[in-house]
Amino acid sequence: MTYVISDLHGDLAGLRSVLEQIRLRPEDTLYILGDVMDRLPDGVAILRWLMACPNCRMLLGNHELMMLNYLDEPSERNRWQWFRNGGEVTLKAFLALPEAERRAITAFLRARPLQAELRIGEWNYLLVHAAPLR
């Protein structure tokens, strides 16, 4: 079975609830269409879980992009934009990690696509957090 969710925004309890409902098996695939972080406190924990989940596929959402923008260029403008959207809680949890783990999470995020194409039976799907690439 293929499952698609998005916009967890740091809600680890919500993710656990979804996992209980779907009973994700090794042969299933779970797509998460971005925005796993910010607003609620467990975005980094969700990222760590995704990094260890062999049958999970994560796409970038605008919140992950805001984080990467800030990490690339920690300007006041990028900080303000990210924090205005709930990023302060994520940055605090991220900075509490050892440097090696921060690098691993950053590399994981940089390797995530913005969209994915999926074929199930005779149907084609374009998975994306917001608007498709042009």
Predicted regions and their residues:
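Active-site neighborhood of divalent metal-dependent phosphoester bond hydrolases
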Residues: 40-118, 122-123
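N-terminal active-site segment of His-dependent metallophosphoesterases
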Residues: 1-47
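Short, solvent-exposed loop/turn segments at secondary-structure junctions
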Residues: 9-10, 38, 64-65, 131-134
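Generic structural signal for short, solvent-exposed loop/turn connectors between secondary structure elements
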Residues: 1-2, 23-29, 51-57, 97, ...
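Residue-level marker for buried hydrophobic side chains located in beta-strands
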Residues: 4, 32, 58-59, 126
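Conserved hydrophobic/aromatic beta-strand scaffold that supports enzyme active sites
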Residues: 26, 115-117, 127
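Short, well-ordered beta-to-alpha junction loops that form the rim of enzyme active sites
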Residues: 121-123, 128-132
